[in-house]
Amino acid sequence: MALLQPARIRILAIGKLKRAWVAEGVAFYRKRLPGLEVVELKDSTPAKEAEAIRAARKPAERLVLLSEEGRQLSSVGLAELLGGWASERLALVIGGADGHDPTLKQQADVLLSLSELTFPHELARLMLVEQLYRASTILQGGPYHRS
């Protein structure tokens, strides 16, 4: 299984981080994932957010939307999925409060869900960067993840 390459991954996130503790948590994991890029896009209607996501996405990026109806994976399953995509560029997209526009969902390569629970998008961003770090350590055989 190939190692995770954070420089090939971009998180496209609707909205800014407003809570300092969330921003600190995201920064903590980003330091451990050199090259991981986070692009913040303006809150709007789902249709306008979809336009902004399409404009921000690079042509060669696989479009992965985080969505409540997406596929749920274990941390090991996510690591395996990301390891299989190690040579590809990824755009992991966190939508706004009203979710993703249906047309964007149709264009997505994959829909993933962090949980059956609903989270504020700020918290989803923190959980996503932590899971990316966890996936990286799983693929490297590091001690962070305990099965």
Swiss-Prot record:
Query: What is the protein named?
Result: Ribosomal RNA large subunit methyltransferase H
Q: Which residues form the signal peptide?
A: none
HAMAP family annotated for this entry?
A: 23SrRNA_methyltr_H
Compartments, record wording: Cytoplasm
Query: Catalyses which reaction?
Result: pseudouridine(1915) in 23S rRNA + S-adenosyl-L-methionine = N(3)-methylpseudouridine(1915) in 23S rRNA + S-adenosyl-L-homocysteine + H(+)
* Family, similarity comment: Belongs to the RNA methyltransferase RlmH family.
Q: Which gene encodes it?
A: rlmH
| Cited Gene3D superfamilies | 3.40.1280.10
Asked whether the UniProt record includes Coiled coil among its keywords, one would answer no
Purpose of the protein: Specifically methylates the pseudouridine at position 1915 (m3Psi1915) in 23S rRNA.
The UniProt record gives the binding positions of S-adenosyl-L-methionine as L66, G95, L114, S115, E116, L117, T118, F119
Q: InterPro entries, per this entry?
A: Alpha/beta_knot_MTases, RlmH-like, tRNA_m1G_MTases_N
Could you tell me which species this protein originates from? Answer: Synechococcus sp. (strain RCC307)
